[in-house]
């Protein structure tokens, strides 16, 4: 497996993860690339650190539910869906957040997971060179996280900026099939929160498989102003009323 190389102590730790069913026993490009990070890091020497390297750190939010009071009824619905899915180990639970850029979709995902006390792990958006990850790389990372987290439990996944995956033209270039993604969505062993800026370009076949969808409309000027004031207060920053209003318009 992992390039056919044996690395003593770290190899035994990886075997421990296999034994505990925390890593699927199959060849996966995303997992193999992360394993190279494990072997290159002298501090990656415990099961916990290896697992952290494979998954990344859980996403954290800096906002509160009050910052999304304009969708309070939908907050409660999503919280119930997420908590129930994790508690019952339900499969195929997918939540789609769509709307304009800058309306808080990603931050809302983090907040809902944090409030539910459910660790949220994001599918990578960059490759190992810091460049934009290809669609196939992101899907491989999604699959790897699904397999690992299904064994750990009490977790969910964020697939941010999913336009390149959920669009109507998915599979037309031969890199993957629509049926393959349908299966990933239908059978996901842990809840996945998807975000997109343009729902009109999402393939209807994928939309039908979403458990719940929320539209994020542009915030009113008053709502934005309230958020600015809360953020400034939380960070103990003093800004003039005129400057806050100027920031609010940008």
Segments and roles (model prediction):
Residues 1-2, 141:
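Accessible peptide chain termini
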Residues 4, 61-67, 124, 161, ...:
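Short, solvent-exposed coil/turn linker segments
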Residues 4, 18, 64-66, 97, ...:
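Compositionally biased amphipathic helical and low-complexity segments enriched in hydrophobic
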Residues 58-77:
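Dynamic helix-loop-helix/coil hinge segments at AAA+ ATPase domain boundaries and subdomain interfaces
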Residues 72-245:
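Walker A/P-loop NTP-binding motif of AAA+ ATPase domains
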């Amino acid at each position: 497996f992992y390039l056919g190389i044996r690395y003593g102590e770290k190899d035994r730790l990886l075997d421990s993860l296999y034994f505990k069913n925390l890593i699927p026993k199959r060849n996966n490009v995303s997992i193999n690339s992360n394993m190279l990070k494990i072997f290159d890091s002298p501090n990656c020497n415990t099961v916990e650190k290896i697992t952290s390297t494979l998954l990344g750190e859980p996403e954290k939010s800096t906002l509160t539910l009050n910052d999304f009071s304009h969708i309070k009824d939908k907050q409660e619905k999503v919280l119930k869906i997420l908590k129930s899915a994790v508690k019952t180990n339900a499969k195929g639970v997918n939540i789609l957040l769509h709307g304009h850029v800058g309306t808080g979709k990603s931050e809302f995902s983090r907040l809902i997971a944090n409030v539910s006390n459910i660790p949220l792990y994001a599918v990578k958006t960059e490759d190992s060179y810091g460049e934009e990850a290809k669609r196939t790389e992101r899907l491989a990372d999604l699959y790897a996280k699904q397999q690992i987290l299904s064994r750990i439990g009490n977790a969910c996944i964020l697939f941010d900026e999913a336009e390149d995956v959920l669009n109507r033209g998915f599979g037309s270039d031969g890199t993957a099939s629509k049926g393959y993604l349908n299966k990933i969505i239908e059978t996901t062993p842990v809840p996945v929160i998807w975000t997109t800026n343009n729902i009109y370009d999402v393939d209807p076949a994928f939309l039908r498989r979403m458990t719940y969808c929320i539209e994020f409309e542009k915030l009113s000027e008053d709502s934005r102003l309230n958020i600015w004031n809360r953020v400034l207060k939380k960070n103990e920053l003093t800004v003039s009323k005129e400057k806050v209003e100027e920031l609010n318009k940008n």
